A protein has these predicted regions:
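Structural signal for interior beta-strand "rungs" in well-ordered beta-sheet cores
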Residues: 1-42, 46-106
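Intrinsically disordered, low-complexity terminal tails/loops enriched in metal-binding residues
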Residues: 61, 123-124
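Short, intrinsically disordered, charge-biased short linear motifs at domain edges
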Residues: 95-101, 110-119
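Cys/His-enriched microdomains
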Residues: 106-109, 125
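Short cysteine-rich clusters marking metal-coordination/redox-active sites
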Residues: 111, 127-130
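Short, non-ligating residues that shape and space the ligands of small metal-coordination modules
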Residues: 119-121, 133-137
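Hydrophobic residues embedded in beta-strands of well-ordered beta-sheets
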Residues: 124-125, 140-142
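Glycine-rich phosphate/pyrophosphate-binding loop
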Residues: 144-147
Length: 147
């Protein structure tokens, strides 16, 4: 777990999850670690800890996972991404991407402030609070740091 993370009540974070610096995990969030959960093997004998391979959820720096969301391992959540409350994440989430729903789908882009960005041109977005400009390059949002 990185520095300055905030983990809210009732969150369940299973190893080998990794949290970057400044991550927010909302109340009741679940980060899973078993891609193919079963109580028994094909012979109906109880699975042992050696009978499965853990896979984790990796949450990038500054990202937020909203209340009651479930992230199904293995997934990577990019830096500064925002997962809307109650979402079920089954795929990787890009940096600054906003996803919502079940399954979680692209719903826009957010900036460092966590606010949805306003489109100001075909490939540019602006934060309504900080006025920072972000650019869409090859399907990924980038911040140039010029503001």
């Amino acid at each position: 777990m990185g520095d300055n993370c905030k983990i809210q009540n009732g969150a369940k974070i299973y190893e080998p999850a990794k949290l970057g610096d400044g991550v927010f995990i909302g109340p009741g969030v679940i980060l899973t670690n078993d891609q193919y959960p079963r109580a028994v093997n094909s012979d109906l004998n109880l699975k042992l800890s050696t009978d499965w391979v853990q896979s984790g959820v990796n949450v990038g720096a500054g990202a937020s996972v909203g209340a009651g969301s479930v992230c199904i391992a293995p997934v990577n959540i990019g830096n500064w991404a925002l997962i809307g409350a109650g979402s079920v994440v089954t795929r990787d989430v890009l940096e600054f991407e906003l996803v919502v729903g079940n399954p979680a789908k692209h719903a826009g882009w957010v900036g460092h402030e966590g606010l949805k960005l306003a489109r100001i041109s075909d490939q540019s977005f602006q934060c309504p609070k900080s006025k920072r400009i972000y650019s869409l390059i090859d399907g990924e949002l980038k911040y140039g740091g010029a503001n």
